């Protein structure tokens, strides 16, 4: 009895929660505007690439 009620509840929850489907719909950012995506990716990857160089520069200038 408890198992049946849990099964009914979970199937009704799944049925009521519908998300958009398709490529790029499960990402936490929009991929619709390619220029916005390009700017975000350049900032993200560029900052990760530049950080070690900036840290080394800071350490060299500190001494």
Curated annotation (Swiss-Prot):
Q: How does it sit in the membrane?
A: Single-pass membrane protein
One GO BP annotation is: cellular respiration
User: Keywords of this protein's UniProt record, alphabetized?
Assistant: Acetylation, Membrane, Mitochondrion, Mitochondrion inner membrane, Transit peptide, Transmembrane, Transmembrane helix
Regions crossing the membrane: 34-60
Q: N6-acetyllysine modification sites?
A: 25
Task: Tell me the residue ranges located in the Mitochondrial matrix compartment per UniProt.
Answer: 17-33
**Where does the protein end up?**
Mitochondrion inner membrane
Pfam families (UniProt xref): COX7C
Which residues make up the transit peptide? 1-16
Disulphide bonds in the chain: none
Q: Which domain of life is it from?
A: Eukaryota
Keyword field contains Mitochondrion: yes
> What is any one of the record's Gene Ontology cellular component terms?
mitochondrial inner membrane
Q: Which family does it belong to?
A: Belongs to the cytochrome c oxidase VIIc family.
What does the record give as the function of this protein?
Component of the cytochrome c oxidase, the last enzyme in the mitochondrial electron transport chain which drives oxidative phosphorylation. The respiratory chain contains 3 multisubunit complexes succinate dehydrogenase (complex II, CII), ubiquinol-cytochrome c oxidoreductase (cytochrome b-c1 complex, complex III, CIII) and cytochrome c oxidase (complex IV, CIV), that cooperate to transfer electrons derived from NADH and succinate to molecular oxygen, creating an electrochemical gradient over the inner membrane that drives transmembrane transport and the ATP synthase.
| Subunit-level organization | Component of the cytochrome c oxidase (complex IV, CIV), a multisubunit enzyme composed of 14 subunits. The complex is composed of a catalytic core of 3 subunits MT-CO1, MT-CO2 and MT-CO3, encoded in the mitochondrial DNA, and 11 supernumerary subunits COX4I1 (or COX4I2), COX5A, COX5B, COX6A1 (or COX6A2), COX6B1 (or COX6B2), COX6C, COX7A2 (or COX7A1), COX7B, COX7C, COX8A and NDUFA4, which are encoded in the nuclear genome.
Q: Which protein, by its recorded name, is this?
A: Cytochrome c oxidase subunit 7C, mitochondrial
Organism annotation: Homo sapiens (Human)
What does the organism's lineage look like at the top?
Eukaryota, Metazoa, Chordata, Craniata, Vertebrata
